[in-house]
Structures are given as C-alpha cells and as structure tokens.
From Swiss-Prot:
GO terms for biological process: head development; head morphogenesis; hematopoietic progenitor cell differentiation; mesendoderm development; midbrain-hindbrain boundary initiation; positive regulation of anterior head development; positive regulation of cell population proliferation; positive regulation of DNA-templated transcription. This is Single-stranded DNA-binding protein 3. GO terms for molecular function: single-stranded DNA binding; transcription coactivator activity. Keywords: Acetylation, DNA-binding, Methylation, Nucleus, Phosphoprotein, Transcription, Transcription regulation. The modification Asymmetric dimethylarginine is found at R128, R134, R138. Residues 245-255 have a biased composition (Pro residues). The modification N-acetylmethionine is found at M1. Residues 16-48 form the LisH domain. It comes from the Eukaryota.
Length: 361
C-alpha cells in the first residue's frame, strides 16, 4: 500500500488507526448520525482536533469504488450490478499486464487448481531470491524440464543396457584382468558380446565381471534352449568361471600341466572362501608334477558346476587332468558342435568315482 524505502516515511499502525477513526467519525456525521459520532469519539478517547472533509467523505467514496470493482470482476459481473468503467478496468488490466506467475487464474485461493509443473516459479524467483528453487538436475541425455520418467537418469557411461556385456553386469564391470593362477583364459581379454553369452545367474557376487572369454573364441550355448544345462552358482561367490581350455560349460577351469608355471597363486583362493577361524593349508593344489588342478579329479557331480562348499577340501587324490572322471572333453581338447545340443556331462556313476573321493564340507 505504501512504498517502502529510505526516502519515504512509512506510516505506523497508530497513524493508520487514527486515519480510520477519523474517516468513521466523518462518515457518521455525513449520514446524519451525530450522536453516534460523538459517542464514538468519547469511547475511543479522541482528544485531537478533527477537520472534516467534503461529503460524502473519504470512507464512503473509497467503499463505493471498491464495491464497483468487486462486482465487475469476471466471475461476478453476471450476477452483480457494476459500472462500465469498472468492467473496462478489469478487461484492460487482464489484457495489458497479466501476472507472470498466475496469469489469468481466477482469484479463488490465488493458486491454480491442478498440479504446478516443474520449473513453474523458477524464471522469476531464482534471479532475485537466493533461496528460490533451483533448477532440476539433469543427468545424461535427460531433456530439460525435470519431468521424471521421460529418460533414464543414468548417463550413457553408467547405463548397463548400452554395454555389450551381460545385462546383469553393470557398466563399471567391463574390463578386469583375470586373476593369476586361473590358467589360460582364451585368446586375450574379451567382453561378453558378439555372440558369446554366459548363462544367466552364473556370476556370483564374489566374482563380478571377470572377462574370461571361452576357449578358442567359441560361442556360448544359448541359455534359452531346451537342451542347455542350467548351471548356476548355488553357493554365491564360489563359481570358478567359464571353461578355460575348450571344455563344456559347467566344468571348472583346469589348466594343462604345461601351464603349471602360471599357478604361483593358488586357484583354491578363488573357489573356496576362508571359513571363520579356519585355514586352508591342507588343500593339495600347489604347483607340482600333476598340475595345479590335479586334485580335482574325484569331485562329486554337484561340485562340478562351481558350487563348492564353504569348508576345507582335504585328502583329494591327485589325478592328471586328462584322467578326469565324468567330463566328456578333457580341457584343451576340441569338441564337436553337436555336443552343444546334448548332455554335456556323462553319468558320474562310473568306476573312477567313489564316495571316498568327495570333498569334505
């Protein structure tokens, strides 16, 4: 109502009350209520001199103008009487200078009825007020406007759907060198792509995203086919990985004796977690004459898919990798494509298998 600034005096509430009391007394005198006017002054203990204005007085004139404009508002002009000047005032004000925030919204509650879109108050609040709303943060290729649900919030470098890797492997798990002691991993580091798909749920949480391409670049079998063997790690974190020497999927990595020089780090650390308070010094899998994986010849059938127990493995006889029981192809030997459609593992109940050759769990 009053312009606030250093050069202009702002009237206090006391001055406003005095003005209003003067206008009320003036109104009562102009309408002929002299006794009411004197009683009013005595009850409010008015002691100053009063100078009356011309009739009908400021209060009456101000009220008439307000009421005319109130009745000429667009939502009431059809039901209330008003002057043409008041109607023209509303029409001109709405067409010439609409409100930048609310526009021509009817003054019900001062706010629109529907939800306010993102960034509604941003263009005119952020430059002036330091505490105004900040623009929404966009990530990646999200379009401006901050409307959720239009684009994924992850940039291209973090979007797993844009990688060539497995869908269950995040974008950050793409290029990792295989650990030492794992034997030959195929022709160099490879990503899962170009036709090579690992079976679903085959990578446990303890071995995320190791780039172990299959031997000789052969494609993985389709996990959706009916003849594929579903081998998933029933014990998380203990899956060894895909075959290293061209063997069928589901067989542990078993390097040939010629590659035993690369086994300075025991592969047992990759397939058997350390039990609480225990040790794993009794596992006979160091580099020797039978190769680093020579003691895995007599594993039980349920241990051949990488789901090893959490305890130590004791007392396994050392066999040559070429004499492994229950595997259709020894590691390093080629196989026919026709094997992909049949059963990869022979029956494990043969002469070379006995209950005494199982792992202690």
């Amino acid at each position: 109502m009053f312009a606030k600034g250093k050069g202009s005096a702002v009237p206090s509430d006391g001055q406003a009350r005095e003005k209003l009391a003067l206008y009320v007394y003036e109104y009562l005198l102009h309408v002929g209520a002299q006794k009411s006017a004197q009683t009013f002054l005595s009850e409010i203990r008015w002691e100053k001199n009063i100078t009356l204005g011309e009739p009908p007085g400021f209060l009456h004139s101000w009220w008439c103008v307000f009421w005319d404009l109130y009745c000429a508002a667009p939502e009431r002009r059809d039901t209330c009487e008003h002057s043409s000047e008041a109607k023209a005032f509303h029409d001109y004000s709405a067409a010439a200078a609409p409100s930048p925030v609310l526009g021509n919204i009817p003054p019900n509650d001062g706010m629109p009825g529907g939800p306010i879109p993102p960034g509604f108050f941003q263009p005119f609040m952020s430059p002036r007020y330091a505490g105004g709303p900040r623009p929404p943060i966009r990530m990646g290729n999200q379009p401006p406007g901050g409307v959720p649900g239009t684009q994924p919030l992850m940039p291209n470098s973090m979007d797993p759907t844009r990688q060539q890797g497995h869908p269950n492997m995040g974008g950050s798990m793409q290029r990792m060198n295989p650990p030492r002691g794992m034997g030959p991993m195929g022709p160099g580091p490879q990503n899962y792509g170009s036709g090579m798909r690992p079976p679903p749920n085959s990578l446990g949480p303890a071995m995320p995203g190791i780039n172990m391409g299959p031997g000789a670049g052969r494609p993985w079998p389709n996990p959706n086919s009916a003849n594929s063997i579903p081998y998933s790690s029933s014990s998380p974190g203990t899956y060894v990985g895909p075959p290293g020497g061209g063997g069928p999927p589901g067989t542990p990595i078993m390097p040939s004796p010629a590659d035993s020089t690369n086994s300075s780090d025991n592969i047992y650390t990759m397939i058997n977690p350390v039990p609480p308070g225990g040790s794993r010094s009794n596992f006979p899998m160091g580099p020797g004459s039978d190769g680093p994986m020579g003691g895995m010849g007599g594993m039980e059938p349920h241990h051949m898919n990488g789901s090893l127990g959490s305890g130590d493995i004791n007392g396994l006889p050392k066999n040559s990798p070429n004499n492994i029981s229950g595997i259709s192809n020894p590691p390093g030997t080629p196989r026919d494509d026709g094997e992909l459609g049949g059963n990869f593992l022979h029956s494990f109940q043969n002469d070379n298998y006995s209950p005494s050759m199982t792992m202690s769990v």
